């Protein structure tokens, strides 16, 4: 197993959102998080990524194993597409940005400042950063937002290649990405007692970015 979660309790601010969450993810496997809006998917991903401390339970994985992609793209607007990828590649100690550029068809945009990109182009660049992290576990929160059908397929292909290479992915998404070796986890049964699944304040979008 590359990640094991045991009896995890998660909170958003002072409010407990989830309790008793247990699952494991193996190398080469994708876990798709399901549940209604506000159920706690973002909170769970933030907790797995170490951005929010758990209230209880354990999360076991290798050190620095998780790359987290949040709702916001978190790009450096003044840097070009290539410079953004080079910046993150340097942070994570990797060198080659070419595979990331190729995977998301960013070559025609390589010299364009990120601040001048469309929403879909920004999303492609944000997701391309996953390929320069070198981290085996991808935790992804609604990663296909702003992507058209063609680029959603590109993203799915990138995840599939990551899985074939022995990586793993935990993805909160409402669409079928057609990934092999994917299974679903409905988090609705883990919603903390007394918190309605439809509570709009249970799990608002995270507006920062770990990547």
Swiss-Prot record:
How this chain sits in the membrane, per its record, is: Peripheral membrane protein
Keyword presence, Repressor? no
Residues the record lists as binding ATP = 35-42
What biological processes does GO assign it?
A: cytochrome complex assembly
Report the main location listed first in the record.
membrane
Cited PROSITE patterns: ABC_TRANSPORTER_1, ABC_TRANSPORTER_2, CCMA
Reaction equations catalysed: heme b(in) + ATP + H2O = heme b(out) + ADP + phosphate + H(+)
Query: What are the ABC transporter domain coordinates in residue numbering?
Result: 3-211
Among InterPro entries, the record links this protein to: AAA+_ATPase, ABC_transporter-like_ATP-bd, ABC_transporter-like_CS, ABC_transptr_haem_export_CcmA, P-loop_NTPase
Q: Which cysteines are joined by disulfide bonds?
A: none
Enzyme class label: translocase
Q: Does the record's keyword annotation contain tRNA-binding?
A: no
Signal sequence range: none
Q: Could you cite one Gene Ontology molecular function of this protein?
A: ATP binding
Q: Which domain of life is it from?
A: Bacteria
Q: Where in the cell is it found?
A: Cell inner membrane
Provide GO CC annotations from the record. plasma membrane
EC number(s): the record gives 7.6.2.5
Sorted keywords for this record are: ATP-binding, Cell inner membrane, Cell membrane, Cytochrome c-type biogenesis, Membrane, Nucleotide-binding, Translocase, Transport
SUBUNIT field? The complex is composed of two ATP-binding proteins (CcmA) and two transmembrane proteins (CcmB).
Q: Which PANTHER family match?
A: ABC TRANSPORTER I FAMILY MEMBER 1
- Member of which family? Belongs to the ABC transporter superfamily. CcmA exporter (TC 3.A.1.107) family.
What this chain does, per the record? Answer: Part of the ABC transporter complex CcmAB involved in the biogenesis of c-type cytochromes; once thought to export heme, this seems not to be the case, but its exact role is uncertain. Responsible for energy coupling to the transport system.
What protein name is recorded for this chain?
Answer: Cytochrome c biogenesis ATP-binding export protein CcmA
Q: Which organism is it from?
A: Jannaschia sp. (strain CCS1)
What is the gene name?
A: ccmA
């Amino acid at each position: 197993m590359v990640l094991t979660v045991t009896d995890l309790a998660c909170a958003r601010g002072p409010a407990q959102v989830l309790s008793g969450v247990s699952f494991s993810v193996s190398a080469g496997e994708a876990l798709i998080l399901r549940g209604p809006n506000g159920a706690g998917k973002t909170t769970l991903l933030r907790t797995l990524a170490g951005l929010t401390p758990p209230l209880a339970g354990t999360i076991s994985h290798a050190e620095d194993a998780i790359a987290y992609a949040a709702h916001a793209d978190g790009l450096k607007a003044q840097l070009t597409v290539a410079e953004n990828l080079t910046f993150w590649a340097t942070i994570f100690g990797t060198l080659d940005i070419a595979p990331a550029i190729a995977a998301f068809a960013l070559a025609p945009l390589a010299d364009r400042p990120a601040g001048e990109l469309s929403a879909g182009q920004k999303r492609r660049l944000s997701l391309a950063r996953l390929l320069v992290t070198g981290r085996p576990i991808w935790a992804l929160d609604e990663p296909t937002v702003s992507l058209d059908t063609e680029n959603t397929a590109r993203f799915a292909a990138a995840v599939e290649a990551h899985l074939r290479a022995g990586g793993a992915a935990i993805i909160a998404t409402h669409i079928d990405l057609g990934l092999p070796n994917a299974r679903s986890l409905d988090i609705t049964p883990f919603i903390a007692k007394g918190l309605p699944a439809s509570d709009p304040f249970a799990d608002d979008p995270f507006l920062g970015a770990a990547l």
